[in-house]
Design a protein with these regions (language model features):
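Conserved glycine-rich Rossmann-like NAD(P)H-binding loop of the short-chain dehydrogenase/reductase
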Residues: 29-43
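N-terminal Rossmann NAD(P)H-binding glycine-rich loop of SDR-like oxidoreductase domains
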Residues: 5-26
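Rossmann-fold scaffold of SDR-type NAD(P)-dependent oxidoreductases
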Residues: 10, 76-85, 126
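NAD(P)-dependent short-chain dehydrogenase/reductase
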Residues: 136-139, 144-214
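Conserved Rossmann-fold cofactor-binding substructure of NAD(P)-dependent oxidoreductases
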Residues: 60-81
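Conserved Rossmann-fold NAD(P)-dependent oxidoreductase catalytic core, especially the SDR/UDP-sugar
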Residues: 84, 88-148, 152, 164
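Conserved S-adenosyl-L-methionine
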Residues: 23-33, 120
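Conserved residues in the N-terminal Rossmann fold of short-chain dehydrogenase/reductase
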Residues: 38, 62-63, 103, 196
């Protein structure tokens, strides 16, 4: 499926991105190129150290921000598949930085869509969250808006051979922003808070999340 393809992953230095890269390299030895797009120079450097160019020449690194439309277009040139994982996803961070959350999660999604349409990308998969269902916070609201943008993009593609998809996750264990580290910390303190006695959390592993996308 992904052999001989060029894949761009936004937010590629995050928890999902790193697991995705690892999985692709293990399963698809003939992948043409994996472009790791993120604004975190240090994390890109760390991935370069983990995967030296002489051993993994298919890896490419692109410093950029999904809020920058022109940079997004540059990154998408020659790309077959986009995995859109870039987001502001910490609930409290989104609440205290609403403008940045909207620019990243909504405007960024629109930039990815427009770049994909302009550059002839074939498949776009956007990562989302169950918090987008009947959202009660800004993070969930922005992801709902993002999801609708990606779904609507299938109606404006015209004759272009491109497909836009959205994958909604529950709590991804092992990812940044997961509630699991918080619970582990509270366990050490001897107190485990419960948001609501009837609350249900849906958990998947990081690898399960990657498998759903692939």
């Amino acid at each position: 499926m992904l052999n001989n393809k060029t894949i761009l992953i936004t937010g590629g230095t995050g928890s999902f991105g790193k697991q995705f890269i690892k999985t692709i390299l293990e399963r698809y030895q003939d992948v043409k190129k994996i472009i790791i797009f993120s604004r975190d120079e240090l994390k890109q450097f760390e991935i370069k150290q983990q995967y030296p160019h002489k051993d993994f020449p298919q890896l490419r690194f692109f410093i950029g921000d999904v809020r920058d439309r022109n940079r997004m277009i540059q990154a998408c040139e020659g790309v077959d598949v986009i995995i859109h994982a870039a987001a502001i996803k910490q609930v409290d961070t989104a609440e205290y930085n609403p403008t940045e959350c909207i620019r990243t999660n909504i405007d960024g999604a629109e930039n990815v869509i427009n770049a994909a349409l302009q550059c002839g990308v074939k498949d776009v998969v956007a990562l989302s969250t169950d918090k987008a269902c009947a959202p009660i916070n800004l993070y969930g609201a922005t992801k709902l808006a993002s999801d609708k943008l990606f779904a609507a993009a299938n109606n404006i593609r015209g004759s272009k051979d491109i497909r836009f998809s959205v994958v909604r996750y529950g709590n991804v264990m092992g990812s940044r922003g997961s509630v699991i580290p918080f619970f582990m910390q509270k366990k050490e303190e001897g107190v485990l808070p419960i948001t609501h006695e009837e609350m249900t959390r849906f958990n998947i592993s990081l690898q399960d999340g990657v498998n759903m996308v692939m």
